[in-house]
Amino acid sequence: MEYEKMKEHLKAIAIWGSLCVLFCVVLYLSTNSIVDNFNSYHRLYLECEKDIPQVPWMILFYESYYLLIFLSIVLVKSPHSIRSLSITLMVSSAIACTIFLLFPGEIGFSRTDNIQGFESLFEALHIIDKPHNLYPSLHITFSTISAFALIKQTKQKLFHALLILWVIMISLSVILTHQHHLFDIATGFVLAWITLKFVYLKLESARHWLANALTIIALFL
């Protein structure tokens, strides 16, 4: 029995984790490439934000976001929750990328690659991620969703506190690495709240696969 449960769990991770990564990466990079060829962009930041100093070592927290997502998919306790989490991340990605296409942003910071000790990380980041998929920040949205899914798995307060602290550090990192502005962070949290409330929690309460399917269809009607 335990072997069968483990087998189903690993199967859900492989199928839904792979589908989620493929969907989100392809959609984000495609949107990024399209928007990079636009002629006009929206500036949704305060001028005073441009005076915020860059803190190079915060890129370590910025990149740790990928680890948080990985852990959330691997550590949630049931195949059903893995499916709920993956679908929520994909819906969030679809909503965000639609906004990126309709309202492409312009970042107020000047990008610098020659940062001693972190050159390769910043160079790779700037090559892959063009400065227009800004709001909502998917770093914020995905981190919040992932942390929430993990928090729902346990009642350990210390674990909850560490996850919340991790999300806070990622939130600080997106602006201290000069990748996002305050508006991007705020809208990232808003998108996370919307998709957690109307997608993740709905899916978690619908245990039957047919109820899951009907719930997703209803979300888009």
Question: What are these model-derived regions, one by one?
Answer:
Residues E2-L68, G105, T112-F118, F122, ...:
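N-terminal transmembrane-helix/juxtamembrane module of multi-pass inner/ER membrane proteins
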Residues M6-A12, V74-S86, I151-F159, L201-L210:
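Membrane-interface helix-boundary motifs at transmembrane edges
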Residues H9-G17, V21, S84-L85, L163, ...:
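Residue-level signature of transmembrane alpha-helical entry/exit and packing/kink sites
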Residues W16-G17, I69-F100, L163:
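Interfacial segments of alpha-helical transmembrane regions
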Residues V25-V26, S93-L101, L165-I175, A218-L221:
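Aromatic-anchored segments of alpha-helical transmembrane domains
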Residues L27, T31, V35, I95-I99, ...:
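Alpha-helical membrane-inserting segments
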Residues K77, F103-I107, T177-H178:
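Short helix-capping/hinge motifs at transmembrane helix termini and TM-loop junctions
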Residues F122-N212:
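Membrane-embedded catalytic cores of phosphoryl/pyrophosphoryl-handling enzymes
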